Amino acid sequence: MRALAIACLLCCASAGLAQSAAPLRLADTWPLPEHELPYAGAQPSTHRLQLDLIAFRDTQWEPDHILRAVRDAAALLAQCGIRLQRAELYRFDGGEPSLRYLSTPVSRQLVRRVRPAKPAVFFVRDTRHVPTFDAEAFGTGNTATRPELVFTVWITAASRDLPLALAHELAHVLMDSGEHSIEPGNLMREETVPGNTRLTPEQCARATAAGEHNGLLQRELPR
């Protein structure tokens, strides 16, 4: 259903943008349905998360690599009672070569053209931003002049320890905060390296409260 919606939007957008932009084409989709996303939390989940994942087929990003990282990142967020209910990777062909890079004006255009549900994760070749980050998250605090990017994560091919980087950036988005931790072993330390996996109860509370407030998380229904 979601893929059809995006495809329809792209067809409409292509007609309107034909004079100014090379058309985008949805090449394929790679769903991760609920039964392929076992919940790894020690306690019952309190909130549900859904993710739209965007990549271009002619980049380094392979679907298996992305989907494996998404599963592993979901296991890290489960310590906060957050259950990944659904994720789907949408791969595109066409468009301008610049769309494969994180660059504010071009990335704003990409989000407008693709219109993903949020939070959304974009897997790109590299960044044009200075200073340079291998991955970057956007919340309400850093998107006043670029509102299209709010609640998106951008992961470049230079990112190491991809599940950790993805979970770290998603936590920034869910908490709607750019703050880092100095606590040893914390997922929100500036460096995403093996061993930095824990989130404190306070961080979890902020992620679930802000995530629910911003419409990024849905509270679990009573069972």
Where are these regions (language model features)?
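Catalytic Zn2+-binding segment of zinc metalloproteases
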Residues: 170-185
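Catalytic zinc-binding patch centered on the HExxH motif and its immediate surroundings
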Residues: 110-111, 115, 127-148
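N-terminal signal peptide c-region/cleavage motif recognized by signal peptidases
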Residues: 13-14
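Short pre-active-site segment immediately N-terminal to the catalytic Zn-binding motif
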Residues: 148-167
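Positively charged n-region of N-terminal signal peptides that target proteins for export
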Residues: 1-4
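Propeptide-to-catalytic entry region of secreted or membrane-anchored zinc metalloproteases
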Residues: 20-119, 123-128, 222
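Extracytoplasmic/secreted proteins, especially bacterial periplasmic and envelope-associated proteins
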Residues: 65-68, 72, 161, 165, ...
